[in-house]
């Protein structure tokens, strides 16, 4: 027993040391957008501070789960006067000129007219240094969508003028914009002359009819105040209107927040969830209206307990979506404040939990996660303004990104959330097919590293109890109003060690050959990250690469095994040394012994 105790002590020591809280990064500025700017497969953060946008490169190796992540400031470029209010700035990223480098679409809200002035900043290399050049785009009603409308693989700008008429443009190699034919009139069939856009709500680019091809959903406001989702489906000819989603009337729900998109009940169909508010400010959320293709409008319970919610100025975005618990049911995050006096806003994870007593045969409900998050010192002393999910170590386990004010400055930090039990995940990232020098698969990089907006994927597998698990999601379904969707798809596989039976991937492109827009992968090992490249002019076939991420339990087990081996080696060395010492002593005794035979 005494010999076993040291080994048990070492195991506990290693397990404890590997589970210690790592020091999370803390940076100055307001989060503007996410993207992989330097093609190293890590998600970087575009930050606005004092009139300047700065790319903060995340430095962490894909398989190095022991090293804490850190951010290094990179290219900076001034977009306004230093005194500009950060609440007036919005960003979205994409490859607008087809050079496989991330460009930045910036909109600045005019304080008087409430119109957004859009400027495209294109990335270029000059004298081996990255620079960003500005090109004025348009004055629009709110921040525009950054999606590929024309099927050429380049990111286009789709928005609305202040009078409600559509603005749609693509760009050439030099970055200068070219209006598409009649402002997208040939891309959209019988598009209305004007739409009354619902202010503060991001438009969506998601699959609503389960064909894995993303549809465009414009958030509009009817004359009676109803929220109407104008859906446009990609067809062989053009984008065509589809009257799929019935409007939400003020008689039913007079006040609503910005919709979010997820497969809430993990049935293989995407759901649109609209927060139902008690008042126009949306401080109190009572429940969520849920729409899907087969179930139409229903209700999902949302238990906020005694908390009110905090949203940003000029925006109706309340919740942000992510697979936090990795149980195949997406969760949400919200900034909330207790109703009792002298309380500060806090970040809360809304667990997607099973519901057995929900109305109208509902099966899921959202409830505040019981486990409290330990905040860093500055964050706990500051005033929290915004929160979202972020994968700090690129290990498939989502952490919390928190933006707050402290000492008169806007800052953001992170809360590490590594303990997800023995759950597994599948991480999928679909890149654009338009490439330059980054499209030759090398040992450490593949493709353009630019996430394709609207790429959708679904998976199916057998769980540990003999049942089936499935889910569907679309990559970056919204890019305006600081929706801050991460540039990849993350699926929780629960506690099942089984392989993923099938993964279906599709890009928002209509083609006669199914192989041109859809691809399937089978028998995928859990805890994997898959990078997918659709067909392009350079490479006419689908390309994929799989990276396996070891879980924390595996790392701890390997560390314990290594320490035990070291202990055994030390014991062997010690016994060998003692044996040699005894042999030397015996030889000395032999040399001093009197030999009677010699007499």
Swiss-Prot record:
It is a single-pass type I membrane protein. The chain crosses the membrane at residues 554-574. It is found in: Apical cell membrane; Lateral cell membrane. SUPFAM superfamilies: Integrin alpha N-terminal domain. GO terms for biological process: cell adhesion. One of its GO terms (cellular component) is plasma membrane. Glycans are attached at residues 50, 117, 163, 361, 378. Residues 1-19 form the signal peptide. The keyword Signal applies. The keyword Cell membrane applies. Residues 575-599 are cytoplasmic. It comes from the Eukaryota. Disruption phenotype: Hermaphrodites are maternal effect lethal and have elongated and strained appearing distal tip cells with abnormal migration. Male animals have detached gonadal cells that do not migrate leading to a partially elongated gonad. RNAi-mediated knockdown results in a mild defective gonad phenotype with 11% of animals having detached gonads and 17% of animals having 'stringy' gonads. Keywords: Cell adhesion, Cell membrane, Glycoprotein, Membrane, Signal, Transmembrane, Transmembrane helix. Residues 20-553 are extracellular. InterPro entries: Integrin_alpha_N, Tip. Expressed in all somatic gonadal cells including distal tip cells, anchor cell, uterine precursor cells and spermatheca precursor cells of the hermaphrodite. Also expressed in the pharynx, pharyngeal-intestinal valve, intestine, excretory cell and canal, seam cells, a subset of hypodermal cells, vulval precursor cells of the hermaphrodite and hook precursor cells in the male. Its main location: membrane. Belongs to the TIP family. Probable cell adhesion protein involved in gonadal cell migration. This is Protein linkin.
């Amino acid at each position: 027993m005494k010999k076993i105790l040291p080994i048990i002590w070492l195991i506990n020591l290693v397990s404890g040391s590997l589970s210690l809280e790592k020091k999370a990064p803390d940076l100055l500025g307001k989060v503007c957008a996410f993207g992989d700017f330097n093609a190293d497969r890590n998600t970087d953060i575009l930050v606005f501070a004092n009139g300047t946008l700065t790319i903060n490169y995340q430095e962490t190796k894909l398989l190095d789960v022991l090293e804490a992540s850190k951010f290094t400031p990179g290219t900076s470029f001034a977009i306004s006067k230093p005194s500009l209010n950060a609440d007036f700035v919005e960003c979205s990223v994409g490859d607008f000129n087809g050079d496989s480098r991330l460009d930045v679409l910036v909109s600045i809200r005019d304080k008087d007219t409430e119109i957004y002035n859009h400027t495209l900043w294109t990335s270029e290399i000059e004298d081996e240094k990255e620079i960003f050049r500005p090109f004025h785009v348009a004055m629009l009603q709110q921040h525009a969508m950054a999606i590929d409308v024309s099927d050429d693989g380049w990111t286009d700008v789709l928005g609305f003028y202040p009078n409600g008429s559509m603005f749609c443009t693509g760009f050439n190699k030099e970055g200068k914009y070219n209006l598409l034919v009649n402002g997208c009139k040939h891309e959209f069939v019988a598009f209305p002359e004007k739409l009354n856009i619902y202010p503060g709500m991001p438009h969506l680019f998601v699959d609503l009819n389960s064909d894995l091809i993303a549809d465009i959903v414009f958030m509009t406001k009817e004359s009676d105040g109803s929220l109407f989702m104008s859906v446009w489906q990609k067809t062989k000819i053009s984008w065509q209107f589809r009257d799929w989603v019935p409007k939400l009337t003020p008689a039913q729900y007079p006040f609503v927040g910005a919709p979010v998109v997820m497969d809430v009940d993990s049935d293989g169909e995407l759901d649109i969830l609209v927060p139902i508010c008690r008042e126009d400010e949306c401080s109190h959320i009572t429940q969520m209206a849920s729409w899907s293709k087969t179930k139409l409008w229903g209700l999902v319970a949302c238990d906020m307990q005694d908390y009110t919610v905090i949203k940003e100025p000029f925006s109706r975005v309340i919740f942000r979506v992510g697979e936090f618990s990795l149980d195949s049911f997406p969760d949400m995050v919200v900034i909330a404040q207790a109703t009792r006096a002298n309380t500060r806003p806090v970040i809360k994870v809304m667990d997607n939990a099973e519901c057995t007593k929900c109305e109208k045969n509902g099966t899921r409900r959202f409830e505040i996660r019981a486990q409290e998050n330990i905040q860093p010192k500055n964050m706990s002393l500051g005033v929290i303004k915004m929160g979202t999910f972020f994968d700090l170590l690129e290990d498939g386990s989502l952490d919390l990104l928190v933006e707050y004010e402290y000492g008169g400055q806007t800052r953001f930090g992170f809360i590490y959330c590594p303990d997800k039990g023995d759950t597994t995940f599948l991480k999928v990232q679909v890149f654009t097919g338009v490439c330059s020098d980054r499209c030759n698969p090398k040992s450490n990089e593949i493709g353009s590293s630019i996430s394709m907006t609207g790429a959708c994927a679904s998976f199916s597998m057998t769980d540990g109890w003999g049942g089936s698990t499935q889910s569907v999601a679309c990559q970056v379904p919204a890019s305006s109003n600081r929706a801050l969707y991460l540039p990849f798809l993350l699926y929780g596989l629960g506690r099942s060690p089984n392989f993923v039976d099938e993964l279906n991937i599709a890009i928002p492109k209509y083609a006669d050959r199914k192989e041109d827009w859809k691809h399937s992968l089978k028998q995928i090992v859990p805890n994997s990250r898959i990078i997918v490249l659709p067909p392009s002019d350079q490479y006419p076939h689908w390309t994929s690469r799989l990276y396996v991420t070891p879980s924390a339990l595996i790392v701890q087990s390997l560390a314990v095994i290594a320490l035990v081996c070291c202990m055994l080696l030390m014991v062997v060395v010690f016994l060998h040394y003692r044996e040699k010492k005894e042999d030397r002593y015996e030889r000395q005794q032999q040399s001093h012994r009197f030999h009677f035979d010699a007499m």
